[in-house]
């Protein structure tokens, strides 16, 4: 029995080794994180199907009470049986991929086991189906909860599934005496091995996923910390002063030897190692930077020759160069240098890419703000381009708080914040955008607000789908929703409802935002949207600004209409109906 246990342990070791190798492949990690998708499940079927085949033909032959340790079995004599790790592969496939994956793997494994033959081979197809159903059930419950079974639960399920196989051998065997002899010999080793193997397999998966989450949390925290400190400088444009301050902050917070920032031609700043010949206000001297600017893609170098610095004895051995963009045009580069090429890792590349995207957004936003002051409708565009700094820092603080608790949620909110600012930037360049884009902006805003105040309010949408292409002023609906969230409910924490509606009428596109809040006092109702109204929760300047934009774009008829009583408030406006496709056709005719 001990000999069989050791031999089975060797077979489990092979499966675990392959699993460990797979969990260090990025594609497999991605597949495990998306295991509920049908494409990933088909891939899991292929992988665990191969595992089950390996388990079958590397089994240990049992003949009576004799253990025969061969190498590979493609066929068994009628009186022989096979001790293997087949149950382990079926069980783990179910715990990871659910019943669909488990049943498919069970059929593959069971049919191949029947093909190999031996005593009562059909039993193992039957037991495989039972095992797949049980493990698949627990795997399905875990997937619904967006998690994996714990190691202890996995070990218990692994042992239970092997017990089920032993019961199937005893119940369905044609030769009860032979079945009892076989079970007495293999039961304890196989139940123990299956339990241990399942636990180890799950521990590899769980530890790898946990390590990935911790790495993402650290990266997100680093990006936020760097972004929070460097954001003010790039709004003023890409110049020597802003570049130097930002580079000094990056050098202090990252494990790099030097940081440089350039425009398309010159070095704006270089701080750290090799600053004696990488001098600001001089032309770019490295070929690597020139290639990054020309191609518009990230470039890496792991030797002085690849960097392309012509200065003799330059101590820089490795570099990451990321382009900075404004309106899809490369305007400069962010460069991270290392004196030891082995210091460069994947996290550094991800961090550099993230910083470059944030810096590019700030440069683009700053440029848009500058340009908006030079064009004819500067007043309207300046109102559109305003970004509430309190909202930004509240969002940053919310994301920072979530990093250690739920890194995946923090990553999603960071993407929503990026989408929010990108929409702000697009709105700063246009008097109107499509209703669909405006609703996307509202959803990004709501994601961030609901993260700050979970379950505080519920927003529902009643939108005529044929109106998605209608043109509306940027941030019009967002301002109305934001106004309702901030002012309608006061300190009420429950049953707060907001309804956003949009439909086409004879008079134009009708947009309304209503709430079930406390209502607006009668004495203030006539002033809202026309002038600043001072109160404990604000001044009403957002509605005033929106009203001014509506008047400027569409005339007095488009002004906000406000109806309020003790049961709630409705703010609406009716604007001329213009479709995005119609605007494109008219634009092409004008050309």
UniProtKB/Swiss-Prot annotation:
Subcellular location: Cell membrane
Annotated Pfam families: 5TM-5TMR_LYT, GAF_3, HATPase_c, His_kinase
Residues passing through the membrane, by range: 2-22, 42-62, 88-108, 114-134, 151-171, 185-205
GO biological process: cell wall organization
Record field: catalytic activity: ATP + protein L-histidine = ADP + protein N-phospho-L-histidine
Gene3D superfamilies cross-referenced by the UniProt entry: 3.30.450.40, Histidine kinase-like ATPase, C-terminal domain (3.30.565.10)
Alphabetized GO MF terms: ATP binding; phosphorelay sensor kinase activity
Modified residues (Phosphohistidine): 390
Histidine kinase domain residues: 379-461
InterPro entries recorded: Bact_2-comp_sensor_kinase, GAF, GAF-like_dom_sf, HATPase_C_sf, Sig_transdc_His_kin_internal, Sig_transdc_His_kinase_LytS_TM
Record-linked SMART domains: GAF (SM00065), HATPase_c (SM00387)
Domain of life: Bacteria
One GO CC term, this protein: plasma membrane
Topology in membrane: Multi-pass membrane protein
Keywords per UniProt: ATP-binding, Cell membrane, Kinase, Membrane, Nucleotide-binding, Phosphoprotein, Transferase, Transmembrane, Transmembrane helix, Two-component regulatory system
Enzyme Commission code(s) on record: 2.7.13.3
Official protein name in the record: Sensor protein LytS
Gene: lytS
């Amino acid at each position: 029995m001990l000999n069989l246990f050791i031999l089975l342990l060797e077979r489990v070791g092979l499966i675990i080794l392959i699993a460990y190798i797979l969990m260090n492949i990025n594609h497999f990690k991605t597949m495990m994180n998306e295991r509920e998708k049908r494409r990933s499940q088909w891939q899991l079927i292929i992988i665990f199907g191969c595992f089950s085949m390996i388990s079958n033909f590397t089994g240990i032959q049992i003949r009576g009470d004799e253990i025969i340790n061969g190498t590979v079995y493609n066929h068994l004599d009628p009186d022989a049986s096979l001790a293997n790790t087949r149950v382990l592969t079926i069980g783990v496939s179910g715990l990871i991929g659910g019943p669909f994956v488990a049943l498919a793997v069970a059929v593959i494994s069971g049919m191949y086991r029947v093909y190999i033959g031996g005593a009562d081979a059909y039993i193992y197809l039957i037991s495989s189906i039972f095992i797949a159903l049980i493990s698949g059930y627990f795997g399905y419950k875990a997937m619904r909860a967006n998690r994996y079974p714990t190691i202890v639960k996995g070990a218990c399920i692994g042992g239970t599934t092997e017990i089920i196989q032993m019961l199937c051998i005893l119940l369905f065997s044609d030769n009860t005496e032979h079945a009892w002899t076989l079970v007495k010999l293999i039961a304890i080793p196989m139940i123990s091995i299956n339990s241990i193997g399942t636990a180890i397999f799950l521990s590899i998966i769980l530890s790898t996923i946990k390590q990935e989450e911790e790495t993402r949390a650290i990266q997100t925290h680093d990006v936020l910390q760097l972004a929070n400190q460097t954001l003010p400088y790039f709004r003023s444009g890409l110049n020597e002063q802003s570049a130097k301050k930002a580079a000094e902050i990056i050098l202090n917070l990252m494990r790099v030897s030097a940081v440089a920032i350039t425009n398309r031609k010159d070095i704006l700043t270089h701080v750290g190692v090799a600053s004696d010949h990488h001098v600001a206000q001089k032309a770019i001297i490295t070929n690597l930077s020139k290639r990054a600017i020309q191609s518009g893609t990230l470039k890496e170098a792991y030797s002085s020759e690849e960097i392309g610095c012509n200065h003799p004895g330059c101590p820089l051995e490795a570099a990451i160069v990321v382009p900075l963009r404004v309106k899809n045009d490369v305007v400069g580069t962010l460069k991270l240098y290392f004196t030891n090429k082995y210091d460069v890792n994947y996290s550094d590349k991800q961090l550099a890419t993230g910083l470059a995207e944030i810096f590019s957004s700030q440069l683009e936003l700053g440029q848009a703000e500058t340009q908006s002051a030079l064009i004819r409708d500067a007043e309207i565009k300046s109102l559109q381009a305003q970004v509430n700094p309190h909202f930004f820092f509240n969002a940053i603080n919310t994301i920072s708080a979530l990093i250690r608790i739920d890194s995946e949620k923090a990553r999603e909110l960071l993407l929503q914040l990026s989408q929010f600012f990108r929409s702000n930037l697009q709105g700063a360049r246009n008097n109107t955008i499509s209703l669909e884009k405006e609703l996307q902006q509202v959803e990004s805003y709501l994601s961030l607000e609901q993260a700050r105040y979970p379950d505080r309010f519920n927003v529902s949408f009643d939108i005529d789908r044929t109106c998605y292409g209608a043109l509306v002023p940027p941030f019009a609906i967002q301002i109305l929703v934001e106004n309702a969230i901030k002012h309608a409910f006061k300190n009420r924490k429950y049953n707060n409802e907001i309804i956003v509606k949009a439909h086409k009428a004879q008079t134009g596109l009708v947009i309304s935002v209503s709430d079930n809040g406390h209502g607006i006092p009668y004495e203030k109702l006539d002033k809202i949207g026309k002038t600043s109204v001072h109160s404990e929760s604000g001044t009403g300047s957002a509605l005033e600004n929106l009203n001014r934009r509506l008047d400027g774009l569409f005339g007095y008829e488009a002004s906000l209409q406000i109806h309020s009583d003790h049961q709630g408030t409705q703010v609406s406006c009716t604007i001329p109906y213009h479709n995005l496709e119609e605007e494109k056709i008219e634009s092409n005719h004008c050309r």
